[in-house]
Amino acid sequence: MSRPTVLITGAAAGIGRAIANRLVQRGARVLLWDVSAPALEQTRDELGDLARAEVVDIADENAIASADMTTWRPTHLVNNAGILGQKRSWLDLEAAEIERLLRINVTGPMLVTKAFLNARALDTPGAIVNMASIAGENGGAPGFAAYGASKGALLALTRAMARDLAPDLRVNALAPGIIQTAMQTGAPGGAANAEAIPLGRAGSAEEVAGAAEWLLLDAPYTSGEVLRVAGGRR
């Protein structure tokens, strides 16, 4: 069995970066994709020889098709890239705003997964983790219904993938709650709403990364599941 090689989208910062760091500490190789070149290069440099980085926009099917997945063939995938969108009632959203959310949060993971399946190394048991959200289960906070809808679609996609790709691949989703990352800045909740979280605080990217590591490398009989990392909040 070869060393695991994990493709991570949205890997330049936040949860994606924390997952990459955790996996490198386990001895895995990581393929880092993001649209932010400077941050991506910095993350790659910090992770060292077990990391390769490439600027890839998962909303662009041609960019995905052109990405290098042959130098290091991936065995595992983390569909982490996503956007929150602007706080606005779904009644006021333009079609273009809704389509952009769905393009990045739903279509992107589907396209990346298809490319991963065509490229993946077959000599190592593999797994996929999709980064959803508790918003996909509860509909999202006021003003973020479109985000919640996109993450709900990703949860449905996770279950379909788990069914269709078994027994060769395990597929699970993570559903974080309020996590201290740049994307969550200005999002509903945060430290000011800590009283709404049973554990009394927001989570960290590292705590989500720990759950991702477990699903990827240490959960051989777990598939088709949604693991909440939300401090008890639903």
Describe the function of each predicted region.
Residues 88-90, 94-99, 193:
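Substrate-binding pocket helix/loop in short-chain dehydrogenase/reductase
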Residues 125, 166-170, 222-224:
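Short, small/polar-rich loop/turn modules that mediate ligand/substrate recognition or access, typified
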Residues 113, 150, 158:
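Active-site helix of classical SDR
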Residues 204-229:
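C-terminal substrate-recognition "lid" of short-chain dehydrogenase/reductases
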Residues 118, 159-167:
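Alpha-helical segment proximal to the catalytic Tyr-Lys
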Residues 93, 139-148, 160:
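Active-site loop-to-helix junction immediately N-terminal to the catalytic Tyr of the SDR YXXXK motif
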Residues 133:
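Residue(s) in the substrate-gating loop at a strand-loop-helix junction
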